[in-house]
Every structure is written in structure tokens, then in C-alpha cells.
Amino acid sequence: MQIYEGKLTAEGLRFGIVASRFNHALVDRLVEGAIDCIVRHGGREEDITLVRVPGSWEIPVAAGELARKEDIDAVIAIGVLIRGATPHFDYIASEVSKGLANLSLELRKPITFGVITADTLEQAIERAGTKHGNKGWEAALSAIEMANLFKSLR
């Protein structure tokens, strides 16, 4: 039996990060976490392309452009959505997650989900580097593992 698992080394890999500017104080912490994860796992900052977009709605289209680049091994999507009083949150959260999943399947390239979807500001803060870890770091770790897995499967 052959078993494939992605290695947790970023050495020699190139990553794209697409990050929204909306809720930038929290998004910046997620971006810092993602970059820290890549570097701690042997990657280099010069092998990371960071693209800033206005909000989470724009993340999938920019992620698709990055993922189409042959020199990018994986894309990390980063944003923060906080529920408000209207259904806007539900529409954005649903479409962003579906858009990223569909792109990853269509392009056959890892696109990981580092978009916090929180009911409250407190929940978002907890997931941006405090009580519940840093979701940017976690998304980067998944990107490292999946990029290596794809390389071994091809």
C-alpha cells in the first residue's frame, strides 16, 4: 500500500497570500502569523507574494489569479468577517468559502481558508492570535502540507 502525506517543510515552495484590508488590524495579525509559519518551516519571505484586496468578497477572484501562476505552489486566503445586524455576513461568508473551494478544485492547486467568520469581535480577536491560536498560521501550515502533497502526487 502506498500512503501519501504532505511534508511540513516550506523549503523551495512559493506561496501567495491574498488578504483583505477590511478589519485590517486583525487581518494584519493573521498575515503575520502566516508569514511566521512559512518562515519557521524553512520558507523564505522572498518566496511569498502578498496581494491586498478591499474586502473578503474580492479574495476569491484575486486568489484565482495568483493560483493560475505556475510559480505559486499554494495560496492562503486571509480575511475577517464579523456578523452584523443584517444578512450581509451570511452572503459574504458563504460565497467566499464556496468561491475558494471551487477555485481550488478547478485549478487543482491548494487554496487554504484563513478567513475568520465570527459572530462577535471578541471571537475574531480570539482567533487572530490569542485564545484560539492564529488562523493565518494554521492556514499557512495547511498550505505547506498540501503543496508538498500535491508535489508528491504528481
From Swiss-Prot:
Q: Which Pfam families match?
A: DMRL_synthase
Identify the metabolic or biological route this protein is part of: Cofactor biosynthesis; riboflavin biosynthesis; riboflavin from 2-hydroxy-3-oxobutyl phosphate and 5-amino-6-(D-ribitylamino)uracil: step 1/2
Give the Gene3D superfamilies listed for this entry: Lumazine/riboflavin synthase
> Its GO CC terms?
cytoplasm; cytosol; riboflavin synthase complex
Q: Which UniProt keywords apply?
A: Riboflavin biosynthesis, Transferase
Entry note: thermal dependence: Extremely thermostable. Has a melting temperature of 119.9 degrees Celsius.
Query: What are its E.C. numbers?
Result: 2.5.1.78
Q: What S-S linkages are listed for this chain?
A: none
Catalysed transformations (reactions): (2S)-2-hydroxy-3-oxobutyl phosphate + 5-amino-6-(D-ribitylamino)uracil = 6,7-dimethyl-8-(1-D-ribityl)lumazine + phosphate + 2 H2O + H(+)
- Positions annotated to bind 5-amino-6-(D-ribitylamino)uracil: 22-23, 56-58, 80-82, 113, 135
- Which GO BP annotation is one of this protein's? riboflavin biosynthetic process
- Positions binding (2S)-2-hydroxy-3-oxobutyl phosphate in this chain are 85-86, 127
Catalytic machinery residues: 88
Does this UniProt record's set of keywords contain Protease? no
Transferase among keywords: yes
- Which molecular function GO terms apply here? 6,7-dimethyl-8-ribityllumazine synthase activity
According to its UniProt entry, the function of this protein is described as: Catalyzes the formation of 6,7-dimethyl-8-ribityllumazine by condensation of 5-amino-6-(D-ribitylamino)uracil with 3,4-dihydroxy-2-butanone 4-phosphate. This is the penultimate step in the biosynthesis of riboflavin.
HAMAP family listed in its UniProt record: Lumazine_synth
Q: Which family does it belong to?
A: Belongs to the DMRL synthase family.
Subunit comment for this entry? Forms an icosahedral capsid composed of 60 subunits, arranged as a dodecamer of pentamers.
Could you identify this protein by its name? 6,7-dimethyl-8-ribityllumazine synthase
